[in-house]
Every structure is written in C-alpha cells, then in structure tokens.
Amino acid sequence: MANTQYAGTGRRKVSVARVRLTPGSGKITINNRSFEEYIPAANLRAVVIQPFAVTSTDGTYDVNVNVVGGGFAGQAGATRHGIARALLQVDPDFRPALKSAGLLTRDSRMVERKKPGLKKARRASQFSKR
C-alpha cells in the first residue's frame, strides 16, 4: 500500500521549514517534539494552524515539521508557509482560499542591516547642538 505523503517547504525571515503531511488525526510534531511543547505561545500556535482553518481541514492530517534557523515567530511563519504549500499538493482547489488569505506568498520582509556610524539600523547617537 502506498503511503500518501505531501511535502512543502516554507520560509520566513531566516527560518526554513520542511513540512510533511500524512492523512491522520491532526497531530502536529515539530523537530520531534509536540506542537504545544515546541511553540508555547498561543498566538504563534494560531499562526501555524491558520492554513487548516482557512481550508476547513482541521484534524484531517498529521503534520511532521523539521524547522531550522531564526526565532519563534520566524519558525512559526515558515511552518505556516510550508503547511499551506503542502495543502496545495493535497488539493489544488485550495489555492483560491489560501491565496486570498495570503498564505502562499513568501513574506519578503527581512531585518534591515546595521549601518556604519549608527548604533543600529536607523538609530543614531544623540545629537548635541553645543
């Protein structure tokens, strides 16, 4: 029997998430740890499960994610992007819903680099008139 697996790669900031969907009960595993253990913040957990809410596929697929780089927010965004791309492989009819929710677009915003002569990217040292 062929084991149906759907894969998707998601990226956000410097994080990269490799996502595998298999038909199941809705169990999410990230880096071999449970979803709740890996992402303790409720707002970031909501970000991760957003593609399932948009496509009404809550609890129908088990998710196995390998995510590297970045922090919690970047990894959550990368995981969401990967899940959305994997759901497209499950059913191409999900594209309009995912596209209108903005889940298929790679968020291109990156950290602005620090400039020489400044303390941070835009923060200059305090100006003294005299």
From Swiss-Prot:
Entry-linked SUPFAM superfamilies: Ribosomal protein S5 domain 2-like (SSF54211)
A Gene Ontology biological process term: translation
Region annotation (Disordered) ranges: 105-130
Biased segments, Basic residues type: 116-130
Residue spans of biased composition, Basic and acidic residues class: 106-115
InterPro entries: Ribosomal_Su5_D2-typ_SF, Ribosomal_uS9, Ribosomal_uS9_bac/plastid, Ribosomal_uS9_CS, Ribsml_uS5_D2-typ_fold_subgr
Superkingdom field: Bacteria
Coiled-coil region list: none
GO molecular function: RNA binding; structural constituent of ribosome
GO cellular component: cytosolic small ribosomal subunit
Keywords noted in UniProt: Ribonucleoprotein, Ribosomal protein
Family: Belongs to the universal ribosomal protein uS9 family.
Alphabetical list of HAMAP family matching this protein: Ribosomal_uS9_B (MF_00532_B)
Record-given protein name: Small ribosomal subunit protein uS9
